[in-house]
Regions:
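Short loop/turn segments that connect beta-strands within beta-propeller blades
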Residues: 110-114, 155-159, 195-199, 241-244, ...
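Blade/loop signatures of beta-propeller domains
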Residues: 15-32, 39-74
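Extracytoplasmic beta-rich repeat domains
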Residues: 13, 49, 69-91, 116-139, ...
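Beta-propeller domains
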Residues: 60-70, 102-116
Length: 313
């Protein structure tokens, strides 16, 4: 029936009233797709190629790569879920590789892809949580911080435990080392400092938290006796290594980001020693001063890929 008095149209007024009460809580931002600096021409012939990286500043520099991909072997381990979304990398040694499997087992391979040792330091119930591990190598020690709030140190030659501890919240960042301390950030946007020798906590520095779990891995660098890190809501914070007190902090997003952190993505922090560079999926590419946290400039670039610094570029 086309008669609006018919029972077919009975719920029409209720629907219209319901529609009036719908509030849009997030907006879609227009993504700019264009070539950056189209007229710019670069002469890279005088760039010095170096295989050295500055790990505590995430600065890869210019690398010598011929553009060839050649398979030289394969390493077998149980398949990780969401492999396209995670940002975890193996540890490359002079004579082998270290990685982990879906149950949290740490596996060390030699150059011939042969397993040297395989160790799992989780209970049966913890294995079901499929912990994801972040690594840091320091001499004969391998430090691990995982996605189920455990952190520990193992002997890199045997895989045996040196010490093992638990945090209140899971970890979600790189691990950085400075002298006798290691630094890592958990899901509550808290930077934690631990002693290398036994894993005891030196201090922690908490920043604002978000209402949702972040979908990005937080980044850290160390410069001028400060640990500088990103968090889930886009804040960049510098903390004094010895005291754990905040030196400076730069919020890069509005307060509404607290409700939208799952969709917010930011690149790793990269420093040349004077400035810090990073970008995000909000059309923002930043350069900030490493000493003060003040903004040098912002360009419209939509990317969460790690910047690469080559010379003064």
């Amino acid at each position: 029936s086309l008669n609006e008095n018919s029972r077919i149209w009975k719920g029409k007024e209720n629907k219209l009233e319901t529609d009036k009460n719908i509030t849009k809580v997030s907006t879609e931002e227009k993504i700019i797709v264009s070539e950056f600096n189209q007229e710019l021409k670069l002469d890279l012939s005088k760039i010095q190629i170096s295989s050295k990286t500055v790990n505590n500043q995430n600065n890869l520099g210019s690398q010598n790569y011929k553009g060839e991909l050649k398979k030289i072997g394969g390493f077998k381990f149980s398949k990780l879920e969401d492999i396209d979304r995670i940002n975890f990398k193996p540890v490359f040694l002079k004579n082998g590789v270290i990685f982990f499997d879906r149950k949290g087992s740490i596996v060390k391979y030699d150059d011939n892809q042969k397993v040297i040792w395989k160790k799992n330091h989780y209970t049966k119930s913890e294995k079901k949580l499929k912990p994801k591990l972040n690594f840091l190598v320091d001499g004969k020690n391998l430090f691990v911080a995982d996605s189920i709030a455990k952190y520990y140190s193992v002997n890199i030659n045997t895989g045996e435990i040196n010490w093992i501890k638990s945090n209140i919240y899971p970890f979600n960042s790189d691990i950085k080392k400075y002298k006798d301390k290691i630094f890592v950030v958990d899901y509550k946007n808290t930077l934690r400092c631990y002693k290398i020798k036994d894993g005891s906590e030196c201090w922690n520095s908490q920043t604002d938290v978000s209402f949702t779990v972040s979908n990005i891995k937080y980044s850290l660098i160390i410069k001028n006796d400060n640990v500088i890190f990103s968090n889930s809501i886009g804040d960049i914070t510098a903390v004094d290594i010895e005291t754990g007190l905040i030196t400076w902090q730069l919020p890069t997003q509005s307060s509404s980001i607290i409700n939208e952190t799952y969709n917010f993505k930011s690149s790793r922090l990269v420093s040349d020693g004077n400035s810090i560079f990073f970008s995000n999926n909000k059309n923002e590419f930043y350069s900030i001063d490493v000493k003060t946290g003040t903004t040098n400039w912002i360009n419209e670039v939509n990317s969460n890929i790690q910047p690469i610094l080559v010379g003064n570029l």
